[in-house]
From Swiss-Prot:
Residues 499-520 have a biased composition (Basic and acidic residues). This is E3 ubiquitin-protein ligase Midline-1. Induction: A retroviral element acts as an alternative tissue-specific promoter for this gene. The LTR of an HERV-E element enhances the expression in placenta and embryonic kidney. The keyword Iron does not apply. The modification Phosphoserine is found at residues 92, 96, 511. The lineage of its organism: Eukaryota, Metazoa, Chordata, Craniata, Vertebrata.
Length: 667
């Protein structure tokens, strides 16, 4: 509060600003203090109005005045509002730093105001102190005059009486140029309050003016709007501030934890080094003692050998000086044997003396450990992996996901997450929903195969790289399973149809051998049909049929209960796209709908969405939609084909094309 109070203090009077002026240099000054500055610059016979400039007492910037003098400077209304609120807070606050001084000032002002507010109705001189001010009459009264002028009867009982206040507060804002006139309009040109005379005969007569109420509503609305935006912005800033403070707290806590961990780990390393130092030092001492003991023994042996040899050498030299042959031969034989024995014994000691017992091949090489210590650093979470969609593979119920990592050496394990993709809009929400994800933890390689997936379904995959410091996830990757693969069932083929060895092509063959009758075989004359070897009861599936010159065929699906003696589409248990020469129709329950304009099909695409109940036919080569059946499936369905001429070839186990994938079309 003391710091704020110093900011609200006038540099001249050292009191809180009163009626502050906003100077062009952005500093403020009390109106009366500015007036006193002008008076101080006046010569003896010079008026204040003749002063056209003065210096700001704060920054010494020269303030140039207009013809209006100080009245031409704008009031610092914002500063005045802050001072008013500060004064209220200071008076009401029991622990205000300037409470005592403010109480004295408040009491003094009260006494001064009480002395100055005199009765305006008294005939006495001086007038008595006013006890009430009548807002209705705009007059202050002493007790005696109040009783005389405001008896307790109408209309005086309707007058509003308040504690005595100065006359200027009763009468409202007065015009700066016409002291006896109240301001009652607003000059838009000068952005100033004026009276009627200013508009009629004053310098504002040619200016654009507006009613106070109009300007009031506009300014109030603008202020309310700005205030709302400011409050909203402050709320956002407070939320951001709270998050920043919370983040700072987390940083402090985590940093303290890491510092403690660092100290603990370094102390442990130092302890290990000291232990190793002690162990290696002990080994060195033991090695030194052992080697010195051996060397001491060798030294003693050498000395003993030298002493013996010296005595023998002396005797031998003495014998060599003997010139008497008989005497020489008498002593030389014994001496020669002793010299030979001494030479042999000294030769035995020589290899031991040359043993490597000087520690010259012993070395302390800690260069590798030093490099490791120099590389010590805190561990961070690994970089996010990247899913390599071009390397990923899929079948109708499996997807093998491949990914790469920039810092694979720092990864302890990977975690694979996946879920069904239901549209672009749900990617973000799915990432925030843990319940919808399947999780495969503790993967050590850069690939993984997920089994048991739905066929013809798109999935979102994310890979998380994990180490002791944390984890980071890859961007979502979208992969989809293929459709259910199937082949033609030869046991169901009509006797006049021939199925290829790979069970993928069927053709009309009048010369086909007779086939045994089975319940699943098409039998009726003209119903030259063959079924697939699967029954589908869930998921989305897509396959294509290559038209190899046939001009009379039907392609569709049927329940297991569909009659084998009828064409497909002729009953309620089958649906078909048919070509009869140049006529193209879709057929169900004997109801035919023509396809117009007639397509020129070389390959037909069939999209079955069992769960959502639809069978759609497409021109596969030109990506043109032909027709869609909406079906509430009651039983599993089987792909079914009828051919009256030439042949048809099926291509199955395909992924659903992107332009047919409804999930790609969601917003």
């Amino acid at each position: 509060m003391e710091t704020l109070e110093s900011e609200l203090t006038c540099p001249i009077c050292l009191e809180l600003f009163e009626d502050p002026l906003l100077l062009p240099c952005a500093h403020s000054l009390c109106f009366n203090c500015a007036h006193r500055i002008l008076v101080s610059h006046c010569a003896t016979n010079e008026s204040v109005e003749s002063i056209t400039a003065f210096q700001c007492p704060t920054c010494r910037h020269v303030i140039t005045l207009s013809q209006r003098g100080l009245d031409g400077l704008k009031r610092n209304v914002t500063l005045q509002n802050i001072i008013d609120r500060f004064q209220k807070a200071s008076v009401s606050g029991p622990n205000s730093p300037s409470e005592t001084r403010r109480e004295r000032a408040f009491d003094a002002n009260t006494m001064t105001s009480a002395e100055k507010v005199l009765c305006q109705f008294c005939d006495q001189d001086p007038a008595q102190d006013a006890v009430k001010t009548c807002v209705t009459c705009e007059v202050s009264y002493c007790d005696e005059c109040l009783k005389a002028t405001h008896p307790n009867k109408k209309p005086f009982t309707g007058h509003r009486l308040i504690e005595p206040i100065p006359d200027s507060h009763i009468r409202g804002l007065m015009c700066l140029e016409h002291e006896d006139e109240k301001v009652n309009m607003y000059c838009v040109t000068d952005d100033q309050l004026i009276c009627a005379l200013c508009k009629l005969v004053g310098r504002h007569r040619d200016h654009q003016v507006a009613a106070l109420s109009e300007r009031y509503d506009k300014l109030k609305q603008n202020l309310e709007s700005n205030l709302t935006n400011l409050i909203k912005r402050n709320t956002e800033l407070e939320t951001l501030l709270a998050k920043l403070i919370q983040t700072c707290q987390h940083v402090e806590v985590n940093a303290s934890r890491q510092e403690a961990k660092l100290t603990e780990e370094c102390d442990l390393l130092i302890e290990i080094i000291q232990q190793r130092r002690q162990i290696i030092g002990t080994k060195i001492k033991e090695g030194k003692v052992m080697r010195l003991r051996k060397l001491a023994q060798q030294i003693a042996n050498c000395k003993q050998c030298i002493e013996r040899s010296a005595s023998l050498i002396s005797q031998a030299e003495h014998s060599l000086k003997e010139n008497d042959h008989a005497r020489f031969l008498q002593t030389a034989k014994n001496i020669t044997e002793r010299v030979s024995m001494a030479t042999a014994s000294s030769q035995v000691l020589i290899p031991e003396i040359n043993l490597n017992d000087t520690f010259d091949t012993f070395a302390l090489d800690f260069s590798r450990e030093k490099k490791l210590l120099e590389c010590l650093d805190y561990l961070t979470a690994p970089n996010p992996p990247t899913i390599r969609e071009e390397l990923c593979t899929a079948s109708y119920d499996t997807i093998t996901v491949h990914w790469t990592s920039d810092d694979e050496f720092s990864v302890v394990s990977y975690e694979l997450q996946y879920t069904i993709f239901t549209g672009q809009a749900n990617v973000v929400s799915l990432c925030n929903s843990a319940d919808s994800w399947m999780i495969v933890p503790n993967i050590k390689q850069n690939h993984y195969t997920v089994h048991g997936l739905q066929s013809g379904t798109k999935y979102i995959f994310m890979v998380k790289a994990i180490n002791q410091a944390g984890s980071r996830s890859s961007e979502p990757g979208k992969l989809k399973t293929n459709s259910q693969p199937f082949k033609l069932d030869p046991k169901s083929a009509h006797r006049k149809l021939k199925v290829s060895h790979d069970n993928l092509t069927v053709e009309r063959d009048e010369s086909s051998s007779k086939k045994s009758h089975t319940p699943e075989r098409f039998t009726s004359q003209g119903s030259y049909g063959v079924a697939g070897n699967v029954f589908i009861d869930s998921g989305r599936h897509y396959w294509e049929v290559v038209i190899s010159g046939s001009t009379w065929y039907a392609i569709g699906l049927a329940y297991k209960s569909a009659p084998k003696h009828e064409w497909i589409g002729k009953n309620s248990a089958s649906w078909a796209l048919c070509r009869c020469n140049n006529n193209w129709v879709v057929r169900h329950n004997s109801k035919e709908i023509p396809i117009e304009p007639a397509p020129h099909l070389r390959r037909v695409g069939i999209l079955l969405d069992y769960d959502n109940g639809s069978i759609a036919f497409y021109d596969a080569l030109n990506s043109i939609h032909l027709y869609t059946f909406d079906v509430a499936f009651a039983q599993p369905v089987c792909p079914t084909f009828t051919v009256w001429n030439k042949c048809l070839t099926i291509i199955t186990g395909l992924p659903i094309p992107d332009h047919l994938d409804c999930t790609e079309q969601l917003p």
